[in-house]
Amino acid sequence: MFGTEIRIEEEKASLVKKEFKIKETELLSKIKKETTIDVDIWAARSVAQVFDRLGVDYPRTPKSDEPSFTQNWLVNCSNPIAQLVRQAREINKFHSTFIDSIQRYVHKGRIHSEINQLRSDQGGTVSGRLSYSNPNLQQIPARNKEFGDKIRSLFLPEE
């Protein structure tokens, strides 16, 4: 295991996190305006209350008959509230997983991530390919143009 330093724009990270939180709050406000319910987007029972209020049928788990709101169902649901829930979840994931992780590990404008070459109790892979930990920089999103680009823009090249 060895480490490397990666420059981070700390102020921009705080601004991007704030921007993401504002967008998430706006989406949750739209849901509340339509349904009068303060929804917890990660709690299936809370999301179920929203769809019950709207009269929208939703899937349930086979064993426990609990509501189930997978990303696939939210993407394919024609109700606009489902899209708002999906977008709010996505934004929440970006700021709570990625930006919080960057902010937690930054020290004097740099992240000192660990690179694992071989499998061990602390990380690594069986195949010998490299893996990162603390934070895992290989998980930074690339597919989402809007949010992924903003998160990746926090990383700066060496001068």
For each predicted feature, which ranges?
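Conserved "right-hand" nucleotidyltransferase catalytic core of DNA-directed polymerases
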Residues: 1-148, 156-159
